């Protein structure tokens, strides 16, 4: 009996655990502190800093089953998903890693044992082929002489991508840095399937499938292209869980493994589909995995960056559900079946099931309102298409008006062998893309420019001033030996009281000083295990090795501590008031305000905001002790400590407790007791994305300042209304009621004036071929009164055509009315369009009534004068 996908995942982890590897949990799909990556797309992402020497772990061997998404940027598999056997937006990457521990011999032997041993995967050895980099004789000999693979099944792959070391079998992290050859293991499905061995002209067939890639990081590539051997070579491997499951379950397509069969059946059930071979079922089964796990990891549907990729995937799934005949929202109903089939890998998702389902349901409901109309428009455009390419302007209109991502439009077109003019679409999108780039958080990361080999010891929990030694200096990202007055730089110390930005808390400010120099610190950031003080040398000179006195801005730190502690209290209060679905999605803690983003699907009611505020202030009055304990990560979680979104934790963690009210993992700085906070006030609550709310609040002196400001505003209003705070509400109600009465009277007067104006105008109508034509520019008439006037004039004139215009603040307002007995010859929409075009505008409407606007008031007289000739031609 073949293993289930869940059993295969566990067997992989168990095997490497038996070989001395630390089993490390999958990291978030949102890469931690790596703005160059849209999503986590490989097992090694969470170990990138370890491979670069910027981070150290208390283990040298690791194994993971890493959740990955490839649906944007360089790795964009979206358009192929559902149409091929192995493309997915979401997949799990099984991996084993050596950080300067074992190398080629053990890596290859481990892989061979797991794949072929009867105790483990028991694959037939004769079905396995391997590739090695052309010049990697060491790996070749291990495969041939130690493992015993015949030479004809070991293939050397050279530089096949047009440049030195540009090869399928040579891996590199970037233009410079760690790199090395790799060996890949392929499984031969048999000659009943078309395809040739790797490196052959038929290698793209489905017979020989890559199941494992083992990378040997043994070089450090320099800027000039030279390769220097690494002092401690490392290993990074990746094996797609879905691919190895297909092999072990004796199927050729990933969509035929047990996991996908179960999901496809669930999709069929919620959509009412009966043909289980329908590709739309495969699309939806894939997409629920990426969408659910992305939301669980904090990504919310939006129109930019990660959120837009998520929205594209959701809408593609909804459209395929529509093709299957789904009559109601269905996508969110697949979260439960997904949790069931993912086994232990779905535990994080299960904890957030309600939130994930609500976000998916809301997004589907929003898109469903425009899906039918958008598809109808697309069908209409495709029906009248003469060539084989849909113009970019139509694709943009579908995106802009109906929310169709361009790849969804391309999906529909591809089914009819029609291409989309993507260049035209991009041209139409240029302005939006420019704005998105400006708002984007993706770009050059100053932190990534600096590599610090040394480590800094943080002593800021107990000290605000400390003597330290300069271990490194950086100017414009480059290491220097000394800096002079006026230069901006990053200063690294061996020990420091300065807190580096982390966990939402901003970095400290202050001063580094000595007898002959002063360095003003404007920010503090982490660089691997080092802490960098960013600022400017105000006086003197500073060099590596100098002793400094590090002084943190004490007053600023104190305000930050209060805000950070209040954030923890508010988080716990939100969970009590709104429910345990509340989890942190982001935060900012500085010396002026605290900002907290959290999962919740609707705006908070005023009474809920008040309840949270009251609950936090109650804990402040209790004056609870704020205590920290260092413990193992798993023990902390077992204790109920909440982990914060987007943070990376070591095996030993700092647990912060506030009496019996709040327990969280936190490395930030805090007050000693909750009473130190003094007062807590919420100043705003708003939405930032679907399913995410944001609260801004102040504490201590900042909160008192807002109380005074509110009191001052009330006093000013009371003075203006000639009242006092005791009867202020009654005074406001009285003023509002009087205002409403006056507005009503004013409207009645306007309507009377318009009726009188209509009566005066009717006498100015002229006869054109038996139809009364009235064209007039009015002054002092509000644009919104034009429709009422046209209705009155129609009643007075009988068979008639009316065009009225008015100008207000330089803008032209136009309206055309045509009596129904004339609309077979003259249509109001065409008439108003002709006039509007002449005044720099556009408009439209029904055959009997149409409105438009324009910007060229000077052209209005000529435009109105043209109406008689145009109408005469139509009535002949």
From Swiss-Prot:
Cofactor(s) required for function per UniProt: Zn(2+)
Modification type N6-acetyllysine: residues: 74
Annotated catalysed reactions: tRNA(Ala) + L-alanine + ATP = L-alanyl-tRNA(Ala) + AMP + diphosphate
A GO cellular-component term linked to this record: cytosol
Compartments where located: Cytoplasm
GO molecular function, one term: zinc ion binding
The organism's place on the tree of life at top rank: Bacteria
Keyword set, alphabetical order: Acetylation, Aminoacyl-tRNA synthetase, ATP-binding, Cytoplasm, Ligase, Metal-binding, Nucleotide-binding, Protein biosynthesis, RNA-binding, tRNA-binding, Zinc
Cofactor note: Binds 1 zinc ion per subunit.
Main location: cytoplasm
Amino-acid positions noted as binding Zn(2+) in the UniProt annotation, renumbered to this chain: 564, 568, 666, 670
Uppermost EC category: ligase
One biological process term in Gene Ontology: negative regulation of DNA-templated transcription
Enzyme Commission number(s) of this protein: 6.1.1.7
PANTHER family linked to this entry: ALANINE--TRNA LIGASE, CYTOPLASMIC, ALANYL-TRNA SYNTHETASE
Quaternary assembly: Homotetramer.
UniProt similarity note: Belongs to the class-II aminoacyl-tRNA synthetase family.
Domain remark from Swiss-Prot or TrEMBL: Consists of three domains; the N-terminal catalytic domain, the editing domain and the C-terminal C-Ala domain. The editing domain removes incorrectly charged amino acids, while the C-Ala domain, along with tRNA(Ala), serves as a bridge to cooperatively bring together the editing and aminoacylation centers thus stimulating deacylation of misacylated tRNAs.
Function: Catalyzes the attachment of alanine to tRNA(Ala) in a two-step reaction: alanine is first activated by ATP to form Ala-AMP and then transferred to the acceptor end of tRNA(Ala). Also edits incorrectly charged Ser-tRNA(Ala) and Gly-tRNA(Ala) via its editing domain.
Protein name per its UniProtKB record: Alanine--tRNA ligase
Name of encoding gene: alaS
């Amino acid at each position: 009996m073949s293993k289930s996908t869940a059993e295969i995942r566990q067997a992989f982890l168990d095997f490497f655990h038996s070989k001395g590897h630390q089993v490390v949990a999958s990291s978030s799909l949102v890469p931690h502190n790596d703005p160059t990556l849209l999503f986590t797309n490989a097992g090694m992402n969470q170990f990138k800093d370890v491979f670069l020497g910027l981070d150290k772990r208390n283990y040298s061997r690791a194994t993971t089953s890493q959740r990955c998404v490839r649906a944007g940027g360089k790795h964009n598999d979206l358009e192929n998903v559902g149409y091929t056997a192995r493309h997915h937006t979401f997949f799990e990457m099984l991996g084993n890693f050596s950080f300067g521990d074992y190398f080629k011999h053990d890596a290859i032997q481990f892989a061979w044992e797991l794949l072929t041993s009867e105790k483990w995967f028991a694959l037939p050895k004769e079905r396995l082929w391997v590739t090695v980099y052309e010049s990697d004789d060491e790996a070749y000999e291990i495969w041939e002489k130690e493992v015993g693979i015949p030479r004809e099944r070991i293939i050397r792959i050279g530089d096949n991508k047009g440049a030195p070391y540009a090869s399928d079998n040579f891996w590199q992290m970037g233009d410079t840095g760690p790199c090395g050859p790799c060996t890949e293991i392929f499984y031969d499905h048999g000659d009943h399937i078309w395809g040739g061995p790797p490196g052959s002209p038929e290698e793209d067939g489905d017979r020989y499938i890559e199941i494992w890639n083992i990378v040997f990081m043994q070089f450090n590539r320099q800027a000039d292209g030279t390769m220097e051997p690494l002092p401690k070579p490392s290993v990074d491997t990746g094996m797609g869980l879905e691919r190895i499951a297909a092999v072990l379950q004796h199927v050729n397509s990933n969509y035929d493994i047990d996991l996908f069969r179960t999901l496809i059946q669930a999709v069929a059930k919620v959509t009412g589909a009966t043909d289980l071979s329908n590709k739309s079922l495969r699309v939806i089964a894939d997409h629920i995995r990426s969408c659910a796990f992305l939301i669980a990891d904090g990504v919310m549907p939006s129109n930019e960056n990660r959120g837009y990729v998520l929205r594209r995937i959701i809408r593609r799934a909804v459209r395929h559900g529509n093709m299957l005949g789904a009559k109601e929202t269905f996508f969110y109903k697949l979260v439960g079946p997904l949790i069931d089939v993912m086994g232990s890998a779905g535990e994080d998702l299960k904890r957030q099931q309600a939130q994930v389902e609500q976000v998916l349901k809301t997004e589907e409901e929003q898109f469903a309102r425009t899906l039918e109309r958008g598809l109808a428009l697309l069908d209409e455009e495709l029906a009248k298409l003469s060539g084989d390419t849909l113009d970019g302007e139509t694709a943009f209109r579908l995106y802009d008006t109906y929310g169709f991502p361009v790849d969804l439009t391309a999906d529909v077109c591809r089914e009819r062998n029609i291409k989309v003019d993507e260049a035209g679409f991009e041209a139409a999108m240029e302005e939006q893309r420019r704005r998105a780039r400006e708002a984007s958080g993706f770009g050059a990361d100053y932190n990534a420019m600096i590599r610090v080999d040394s480590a800094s010891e943080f002593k800021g929990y107990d000290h605000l001033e400390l003597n330290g030694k300069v271990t490194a200096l950086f100017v414009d990202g480059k290491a220097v030996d000394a800096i002079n007055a006026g230069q901006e730089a990053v200063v690294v110390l061996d020990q420091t009281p300065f807190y580096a930005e982390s966990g939402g808390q901003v970095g400290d400010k202050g001063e580094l000083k000595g007898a002959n120099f002063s360095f003003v610190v404007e920010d503090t950031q982490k660089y691997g295990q080092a802490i960098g003080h960013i600022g400017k040398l105000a006086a003197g000179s500073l060099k590596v090795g100098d002793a400094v006195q590090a002084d943190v801005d004490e007053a600023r730190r104190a305000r930050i501590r209060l805000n950070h502690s209040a954030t923890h209290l508010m988080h716990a209060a939100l969970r009590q008031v709104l429910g345990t679905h509340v989890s942190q999605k982001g935060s900012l803690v500085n010396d002026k305000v605290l900002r907290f983003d959290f999962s919740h699907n609707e705006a908070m009611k005023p009474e809920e905001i008040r309840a949270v505020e009251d609950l936090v202030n109650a804990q402040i009055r209790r004056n609870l002790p704020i205590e920290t304990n260092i413990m193992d990560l798993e023990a902390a979680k077992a204790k109920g400590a909440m982990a914060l979104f987007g943070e990376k934790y070591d095996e030993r963690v700092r647990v912060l407790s506030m009496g019996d009210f709040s327990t969280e993992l936190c490395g930030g700085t805090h007050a000693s007791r909750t009473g130190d906070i003094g007062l807590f006030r919420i100043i705003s609550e708003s939405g930032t994305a679907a399913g995410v709310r944001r609260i801004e609040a102040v504490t201590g002196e900042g909160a008192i300042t807002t109380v005074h400001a509110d009191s001052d505003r009330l006093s000013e209003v009371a003075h203006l209304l000639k009242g006092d705070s005791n009867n202020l509400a009654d005074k406001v109600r009285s003023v509002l009621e009087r205002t409403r009465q006056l507005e009503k009277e004013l409207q009645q007067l306007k309507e009377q004036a318009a009726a009188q104006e209509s009566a005066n105008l009717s006498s100015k109508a002229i006869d054109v071929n038996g139809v009364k034509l009235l064209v007039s520019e009015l002054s002092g008439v509000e644009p919104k009164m034009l429709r009422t006037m046209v209705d009155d004039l129609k009643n007075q004139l009988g068979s008639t055509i009316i065009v009225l215009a008015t100008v207000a603040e330089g803008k032209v307002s136009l309206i055309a009315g045509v009596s129904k007995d004339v609309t077979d010859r003259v249509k109001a929409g065409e008439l108003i369009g002709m006039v509007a075009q002449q005044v720099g505008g556009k408009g439209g409407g029904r055959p009997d009534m149409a409105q438009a606007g324009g910007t060229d008031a000077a052209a209005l007289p000529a435009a109105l004068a043209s109406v008689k000739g145009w109408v005469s031609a139509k009535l002949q």
